[in-house]
Structures are given as C-alpha cells and as structure tokens.
Amino acid sequence: AVMTPRVAGWEGVVFQPVRAPAEGVRTRRLSPLMLAETFLDRLERLGPRYNAVVTITRDRALAQARRAEAEIPTGRYRGPLHRIPYGAKDLLATSGGIPTTWGAAPFKDRVFDFDATAILRLEAAGAVLCAKLAMVELAGGMGYRQPNAAFTGPGVNPWNRDAWSGGSSSGSGSAVAAGLVPFAIGSETWGSILSPAGHCGIAGLRPTYGRVSRHGAMALCWTLDKLGPLALTADDCGLVLEAIAGRDPVDPTTADRPYRYPGGGPAGRRFRFGVLRDITDGCEPEVRDNFARSLDVLKGLGTVDEVTMADLPYDDITRTILFAEASSAFEDLIESGGIAGLTAPEDRYTAYARDAILAKDYLKSLRLRGVMAREADRVLARLDALVAPGRATVAAMLGTEVRSAIRGTARDMMGAVGNGAGLPGLAVPNGFGARGLPTSLQFMGRAWEENTILAVACAYQSATDWHRHHPEEF
C-alpha cells in the first residue's frame, strides 16, 4: 500500500524532500520549533512500532530549534539543513548525558562526554538532532544471522510489519521510510547503508572511504568503516554529505579533499553506465524484472554496456579483512567474555572463530585489495557508474535466517568491491517485489566522484516516481 503525504497542518512536512521544509524555514513560513515538535511527536508515537529508536533527544532538539527561532529573523541562515530534524545511528557519540549504546545490551547505559565529528558538523549546519536510532548490536560485527540482534528488538520494515528493515543501520532505514525523521546518519562496513535503504524504499549513500570523519563513531573495521546519509532522495543525500564531509585533524584517515554538492547535475547530460555480466544471478524474479525495467530508463539517460572484471576472490578479500579487524577492534569484549551479554545467541560465540585468522591471510588480503581497487578503477575509468540491483532479494521476514555475503551465504560482488576498494555507492528505490516490499537500484562510481553518482541517481529519480511512494502507518 502507498500513501500520498498529507498536506494539511504541520504533518504536511512529513515525506517531503529536505529542500521543501528548508525553504519554508528560510522564508519563515515554517517554525523550526514546530518542525522539531512534529518529528519528535512521530518518533515518540510511532518509533516503538518499528523498534527504530533508542533515545529521543527531545531537550537537545528543542534547545537547538529555539536558537533557530532567534537566528533566522536576524538573517543568520546556515543553509538547506538549517533546523531540519534528523536521527543518528547509535554508534555516534553524543554528549549531554545521551546514551551511546552501539545497539548492544552491555552498553545500554553508557554515555560519553563529547560529540562525534559528524554530529558536530551537522549542528554547525543547523540540523536538529532528534533521536539516536537503533542498530544491529556492534554493527553486526559479531556475526549475527537473524534480525533479532539488538536489545531494542528487530528492525521492523515500515512496508510490512512482519519484515526486517535491514542491517546494521536498521533504525535509520525504518525511521526515514516511516517519516519519523527527514534524514538519518548510518554507517557501512559492508552493506549497512545500502541494505536498509534498499529494503525500506529510500535513498542511501555510502561515501568514499576517508570522505567523512569517523571520530566518535564505534570502530568495527578500521579500513572499511564509512559514515553516510539515508534520506528520501538522492538529492537529500548530497545535501547531507556536504555538511558532514571534509578533513578532520582527529581522524587521520580523512582526506584533505574539500567537498561541495552542486545539486543534481546539468540537465540533459548523457551518462555512461556499465553492468557486470551475470550480476543478477541469484536475484529474486521481481528483483531481476525491476532491474531490467530500470535499465530501460537508464538507456534513455545514456548508454548501457556490459562489462567484465578480472576473476578475483572479491568477497573473500573483503570478508577476511573485515573478520580480522573486527576481532581486533572488539578484542577486550571478546576475551573478557563480555559478548555473553549480547542479544543474538550466535553473537556470543561466532567471534571466537575469527581469532583463528592467520596474519599471513590478512596481509595477503590487504595486498589483493590493491589489485581489486586497480581493477575496479580500470573498469570505472570509462564509465559514470556501474549499476546493479541494490539487493538480490527483498527484505527478509522476521524470525528467519538472513542471507549474508559477509558470512558467505550470499554473493555480493558490488558490495565486496565497493567496500573493499572504498568506492562510493548509492541505492535508490526502483519498484516493489514479493509481499509488497521495495526493491532497489545501486550505482557505484570511482573514488571521490560522489557527485557523479548523485547526478546519475537524481536523473533516474527525475524519470521515475518510486521515491514518492510511502508506506501507510500501522
């Protein structure tokens, strides 16, 4: 079922792309305080239905909104995110007594005395933090196999109460799709932004590794982790990325590459798309059908050519790096036996097996990652984007086992290459599949070329209306 956003009263700002309420705030037709109240109400009233929220930051949000009431009349307008409410995945540190739980029961009362850089940059852009959003415990780093792997319960998909919203940024996906916040910040090590975005019918952007500071974010895998936005449209993702991107002296992995988002790109531009041979193998029939229809749309926007990549163990390379670094990142928790307090039973023992990864295998994977990155760049050098189904299947049903490329029970060449080589990727909705659940289309580009795939995705969304479909409340 789909709904048309209501236009009467303050609820009329729900399911609107960021630029709409931003213009209302700028012209003083919308009160920042009432805007915050609208989404705080939805978070409090609807958040529990989706297991989407860990902590509602009402006091902080209202204080920020009140400051905006005083700033805007004086002409101090900070840009399109000025006083736009948002939520942050609960692996980003927040001060002021707001817990940062990492989705894990052993840390549910833990607080920090500082804010993550991404939180500070959004505050500087004028955005209003309304909630810390639920996530799979420890961002899935302990090897979970089913949706119920968080002390807040499984992420519920707003399109079907019996389906999962996807991991590990489950609350971010649910909250945006259900209209609880206009945008959210998630993280991806392998699939944790693109998966909930695709399963929930919204847009999700994985930036180039090093584009966004991870200072104050939980570390799962130092050489794979990335922070990025989930929002209603690709254009929204670009606006948010501009706010959070940039070098950070306290995160030495960030690159000294200033980033500006120019908008959707020049009208009438022709793009060059590539499709990897056999990329739809293993996809559900509806996913394949929707991808084929998406390719027809893309052929109206440019050229679509089949491409091939060298035969390398892409999944194994990225999987070995992830497993080895995760076992190191959580060494104290694992060796102390603290993982016994996690929610998913398999998370209490799977991590021990990863301690058996040999140093020579980790180092071999790091060396092969360089080969993988060069091969990906060879293919992408003559393209604007590689395109593929966002996910091979629609969202899993609650209570079932989740197929995962990370565990080797599913294939995800795009995810392995994109995350292993640190390349930007973007998922947008492209239809519906089994049980009325969304399917998605993903674009992957060269390192540092987020604006190219954003332009591609904006062009696709200008030619389709899947991003205007929203779930009914339940």
Regions found by a protein language model. Name each.
Residues A20-T27, T38, R42, A70, ...:
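Serine-dependent amide/ester hydrolase catalytic core
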Residues A20-T27, G87, P106-V111, D225-L232, ...:
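Short, well-ordered beta-strand elements within core beta-sheets of diverse protein domains
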Residues L81-L227, L276-D278, G390-I406:
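Short glycine/serine-rich loop/turn segments
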Residues R45, A124, V128, A177-A184, ...:
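Structural helix-boundary/capping segments
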Residues A1-A63, G300, H469-F474:
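An N-terminal boundary/leader segment
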Residues P5-G9, H82-W102, A267-L276, I321-D377, ...:
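Short helix-loop capping/hinge segments that flank enzyme active sites or metal/cofactor-binding pockets
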Residues R29, L33-A36, E44-F112:
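N-terminal, positively charged, Ser/Thr/Ala/Gly-biased leader segments
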Residues F39, A61, K89, L122, ...:
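Conserved hydrophobic/aromatic pocket- or pore-lining residues that grip, position, or stack substrates
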